[in-house]
């Protein structure tokens, strides 16, 4: 009963939602709670449903809603990948799943866009981007930030990057997350609850984003 009241209190305090959230989890995290990605996706969808029910102009609702969610899983062995892919793919039953692993990209489902990137490093992404620019004959003098961003695999900037159960990050989205807010939760991924997610959102809205200034 108290837990439910506390959740309601947290919900009432959240007025500003990040438009894009990125979770960085390890293979061990996924093995401990393979269903958690689906759960977190459901929490985001529920929040968007609550916003849709509010008496707000359409533009305000779109600005307030969570528009994208990313899960980066730093590394999985081929055996682990085969074991956990069926659970990950369940996300497509409640959202639009964009799944990256190896050289494969699969898209399925509709609704909130959820990107799951397995074993993709930021260094690898930027290296591939530079290689494509060179193959296309782009001259160094023609390259600027927009040119580089146009050939990145992941073309979005997360508002907040969340790491559960630790205080270290992987090198995923090293270009895109340069101005992102960081949140380190002392709760391990397996035990990460809806109330912990709401605490992340409450903390996010209290921050003053400076975007490098």
Model-derived features with residue positions:
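Flexible, compositionally biased loop and terminal segments
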Residues: 1-213
